[in-house]
C-alpha cells in the first residue's frame, strides 16, 4: 500500500529562488541529514536525472529519479530505479506577490517488498515528512 505525504509552507522569498533551491540537488548532502550523497546524471532546462543516497547509520539505499522541470513553477519527480515499486512527487512553487511564495510537496511512494519497508521505511518516511521544513530552514540560511 502506498504512502502519501503532502506538506506546504508560506515563505517570504520569490518562487524562482525557492525553485532553484529545491532543484540544486548537488547541495542536498550539505543540509538534508538523511542524504549522504547526490549526483546529477543528466541536466537541461526542462529535465534532470538525479541519484540520491539516503542513509542512517550503516543502512544506505540509492535511488534515481527523472525530474521534469518547469522553472520557477514546479518539479515533477518519477522513479527510474531504486528500492521502491512507486515513487512520484511534485514540488509546486506558487508566487504570492514578488517576494513571497507557497511551496507544496506532494509525494507518493511504496517500497519494493517487506524487507525494504522494514529497513528503509522509517528513515524515508521521516525524511519525506521533514523535507519541506528542511528546505524552509535552508532558504532562511541562504536568503536571510
From Swiss-Prot:
Query: Which branch of life, at top level?
Result: Bacteria
Write out the entry's keywords from A to Z.
Toxin-antitoxin system
Keyword Hydrolase, does the record have it? Answer: no
Return one GO MF term.
ubiquinone binding
Set out the biological process GO terms recorded for this chain's protein. Answer: cellular respiration
Question: Which InterPro entries does the record cross-reference, listed alphabetically?
Answer: COQ10-like, COQ10_START, START-like_dom_sf
**Disulphide bridges in this chain?**
none
- Cited SUPFAM superfamilies: Bet v1-like (SSF55961)
Instruction: Report the protein's function.
Output: Toxic component of a type II toxin-antitoxin (TA) system. Binds to 50S ribosomal subunits, preventing them from associating with 30S subunits to form 70S ribosomes. Its antitoxin is unknown.
Q: Which family does it belong to?
A: Belongs to the ribosome association toxin RatA family.
Stated name of the protein = Ribosome association toxin RatA
Q: Which organism was this protein described from?
A: Pseudomonas aeruginosa (strain ATCC 15692 / DSM 22644 / CIP 104116 / JCM 14847 / LMG 12228 / 1C / PRS 101 / PAO1)
